[in-house]
Amino acid sequence: MGEHPSPGPAVAACAEAERIEELEPEAEERLPAAPEDHWKVLFDQFDPGNTGYISTGKFRSLLESHSSKLDPHKREVLLALADSHADGQIGYQDFVSLMSNKRSNSFRQAILQGNRRLSSKALLEEKGLSLSQRLIRHVAYETLPREIDRKWYYDSYTCCPPPWFMITVTLLEVAFFLYNGVSLGQFVLQVTHPRYLKNSLVYHPQLRAQVWRYLTYIFMHAGIEHLGLNVVLQLLVGVPLEMVHGATRIGLVYVAGVVAGSLAVSVADMTAPVVGSSGGVYALVSAHLANIVMNWSGMKCQFKLLRMAVALICMSMEFGRAVWLRFHPSAYPPCPHPSFVAHLGGVAVGITLGVVVLRNYEQRLQDQSLWWIFVAMYTVFVLFAVFWNIFAYTLLDLKLPPPP
């Protein structure tokens, strides 16, 4: 998963090493060859004229000779690419992509065009799978709308690395909550405790120059009722998404939602503090739900309409709780209770940057024009919010609550 999946099993490593040693007897005196150099040695055996191309027939012969070493779905994908080349040739870069599982837009298009070999039974029809294989298949059907992507993910996923980002963030949030609960002697509606806002992790408008608070507020929650839903959504939605798209991409969407949430509060609800990870959570969940809607016919997860309704109800209940708390009489006047605007900032990130990430499984984001459009929009918003925080509070002569 991620940008560079681990090399596939198309050619056994030992057999490949023996070929390289035979063709390059002085290899021991040089530095180890890069993986692409290994593939070049194998490619040249089928391209004696050094034309840079091999025939699809030779490529199919290579696959047939190593069929016992191939995952069945991987073999389908490779044959699909071979069948898609109308000129009957495969270039070296496509060959490297095939053998190392590196995929590009042109690579995906070629695979999708070679659909004759992809008409075999779907993953759902596979029998005799182990528990881990069923889990991987379940994650594939929960998150990916195309059968070719589901098969590719099923064959490529190795759980190395595991979904560490969402699990680590969740454990830290729970740990900070328990620590605060013990120190304050309060677990429900912790935010009403007089000493709650004194924590250096909370975003407070009077302390907005302390830039770490725009991010660290996610480790503080209003109470167990606030933490509970965020943790459940992070584990049920965030972890599967990270298993498919990788920690870098999902972490990017999550952190972008968190920062957008606090900046949105500093612009739209200028006197309120911010706590909770709802900005990041709503970014991931909104992106996931939007991706399901945009690929409705392709998504094969069970009871998707009912589950979407449940997710929307839970998100609405949490948002309603945040709105109620914001306008509830404050326990520490004149400072109001935490804002709900961070939720909206997270949704905005989810339906823009998040959707682009989820719709481009293992594709280069920098090749997507929408990606750059949304990155530009996000950058403009961040710069606007920074200038707003520097100048607007003074120009508006806003009376802020005293620092905690």
UniProtKB/Swiss-Prot annotation:
The active site is at S278 (nucleophile), H343. The keyword Nucleotide-binding does not apply. GO terms for cellular component: membrane. It is found in: Membrane. It catalyses: Cleaves type-1 transmembrane domains using a catalytic dyad composed of serine and histidine that are contributed by different transmembrane domains. It holds the Pfam family Rhomboid. Keywords: Hydrolase, Membrane, Protease, Repeat, Serine protease, Transmembrane, Transmembrane helix. It is a multi-pass membrane protein. GO terms for molecular function: calcium ion binding; serine-type endopeptidase activity. The chain crosses the membrane at residues 164-184, 218-238, 250-270, 274-294, 303-325, 338-358, 371-391. Gene3D superfamilies: EF-hand, Rhomboid-like. Its EC number is 3.4.21.105. SUPFAM superfamilies: EF-hand (SSF47473), Rhomboid-like (SSF144091). GO terms for biological process: proteolysis. InterPro entries: EF-hand-dom_pair, EF_hand_dom, Peptidase_S54_rhomboid_dom, Peptidase_S54_rhomboid_met, Rhomboid-like_sf, Rhomboid_IM_Serine_Proteases. Belongs to the peptidase S54 family. May be involved in regulated intramembrane proteolysis and the subsequent release of functional polypeptides from their membrane anchors. This is Rhomboid-related protein 3. It comes from Homo sapiens. The lineage of its organism: Eukaryota, Metazoa, Chordata, Craniata, Vertebrata.
